[in-house]
Curated annotation (Swiss-Prot):
UniProt EC number: 1.2.1.38
PANTHER family referenced in this protein's UniProt entry, alphabetically: N-ACETYL-GAMMA-GLUTAMYL-PHOSPHATE REDUCTASE, CHLOROPLASTIC-RELATED, N-ACETYL-GAMMA-GLUTAMYL-PHOSPHATE REDUCTASE, CHLOROPLASTIC-RELATED-RELATED
Database matches in SUPFAM superfamilies: Glyceraldehyde-3-phosphate dehydrogenase-like, C-terminal domain, NAD(P)-binding Rossmann-fold domains
Entry annotation: catalytic residues: 150
Identification of the protein by name: N-acetyl-gamma-glutamyl-phosphate reductase
Pathway it works in: Amino-acid biosynthesis; L-arginine biosynthesis; N(2)-acetyl-L-ornithine from L-glutamate: step 3/4
UniProt function note: Catalyzes the NADPH-dependent reduction of N-acetyl-5-glutamyl phosphate to yield N-acetyl-L-glutamate 5-semialdehyde.
HAMAP family: ArgC_type1 (MF_00150)
Compartment annotation: Cytoplasm
Alphabetized PROSITE patterns for the sequence: ARGC
InterPro entries: AGPR_AS, AGPR_type-1, NAD(P)-bd_dom_sf, NAGSA_dehydrogenase, Semialdehyde_DH_NAD-bd
Gene Ontology CC terms, in alphabetical order: cytoplasm
The organism's place on the tree of life at top rank: Bacteria
Length: 344
């Protein structure tokens, strides 16, 4: 049984960890922290978890307690894992971080986008980027895993087959992405209020979103060269979901793109390449650790359109983190993650 600690248990990704791990036969949550809710029973904050965590309460983060865990998940804002990851690694505890703290390889690039110096640059070289469909072998040997962001997960999985095969003009890639409001977190903010988001949709951060350098870094690895990427995120009136509409120009029209995508993801348990002509819906992946993809070539031209959908809290966050944990500890990758999406 893998002993699990969670730092930052009161946000949406924290409670999603609890939901997923409640169904995991080989993992037990033994510590969950929250400075603001210390002493409060988990089941009192989250009634949906009654009967699953009745003996578990939030506590103040303590290195000695967390260091007794086999793995600690960080479901925290950026900067928190910087301060604690080194001590936990020294104690022999594995660290899986959902924040952006260890996703970028360049400390200066991180500081540019997050507005503060990187707090643990000595750990960047060791950190493994936790996209299993790319780095599964490295994840098996990792001590520190940086779980990809939600937009980067949907976007990279959609573009990867084209870039790995050298079929796309990488100088002009476009990612037009839509997100549900849970991606903004649980904190109170005017832009996330029901009356602000309901019956409306808007683009934001067009000049540059923090996920842009992460996406470019992953696509550059896949292509083996620098890429030109325009990334435009949008906020939509739904709670969960990412829908990425991706555009690329192909350099060889003779390739069967449907077969290319099906072959690339044939052995990936959490990527579903839909039949030709399909249009994946975000509701089809709600609550599931699945990226559902469809590839199109309108009018048989040289423009490829890839549609990629995920649940931002599952394959875009906590589910992907549990997938990484399963790989890291030599478990069946699908443990605790095999449930289907919820409909309607």
């Amino acid at each position: 049984m893998v002993k699990v600690g969670i730092v930052g248990g009161t946000g949406y990704t924290g409670v999603e960890f609890l939901r997923l791990l409640a169904q995991h036969p080989q993992a037990e949550v033994v510590v969950i922290t929250s400075r603001s809710e210390a002493g409060l029973a988990v089941a009192d904050m989250y009634p949906n978890l009654r009967g699953h965590y009745d003996g578990l309460a939030f506590s103040v983060p303590d290195i000695s307690t967390l260091g007794a865990c086999d793995v600690v998940f960080f479901a925290t804002p950026h900067g928190v894992a910087h301060a604690l990851a080194g001590e936990l690694l020294a104690a022999g505890t594995k660290v899986i971080d959902l924040s952006a703290d260890f996703r970028l390889q360049d400390a200066d690039e991180w500081a540019k986008w997050y507005g503060q110096p990187h707090g643990a640059p000595e750990l960047l070289e060791e950190a493994v980027y936790g996209l299993p469909e790319v780095n599964r072998e490295q994840i098996k040997q990792a001590r520190l895993i940086a779980v990809p962001g939600c937009y980067p997960t949907a976007t990279q999985l959609g573009f990867l087959p084209l870039l790995e095969a050298g079929l796309a003009d990488v100088s002009r890639l476009i990612a037009d992405c839509k997100s549900g409001v849970s991606g903004a977190g649980r904190g109170a903010a005017v832009g996330s209020l029901y009356s602000e988001t309901s019956e409306s949709m808007k683009a934001y951060a067009v000049k540059g979103h923090r996920h842009l350098p992460e996406i470019r870094q992953g696509l550059r690895r896949a292509a083996g060269q620098d890429v030109g990427l325009t990334f435009v995120p949008h906020l939509t009136p739904m709670i969960r979901g990412i829908h990425s509409t991706l555009y690329a120009t192909v350099v060889d029209r003779s390739v069967d793109l449907q077969a290319l995508f099906e072959k690339r993801y044939a052995n990936e348990p959490f990527v579903d390449v839909m039949p030709a002509g399909s249009h994946p819906e975000t509701r089809s992946v709600r609550g599931a650790n699945v990226c559902r993809i469809a590839v199109h070539r309108p009018q048989d031209g040289d423009l490829v359109v890839v549609l990629s959908v995920i649940d931002n809290l599952v394959k875009g966050a906590s589910g992907q983190a549990v997938q990484n944990m399963n790989i890291l500890f030599g478990l069946d990758e699908k443990l605790g993650l095999s449930h289907a999406g919820m409909l309607p």
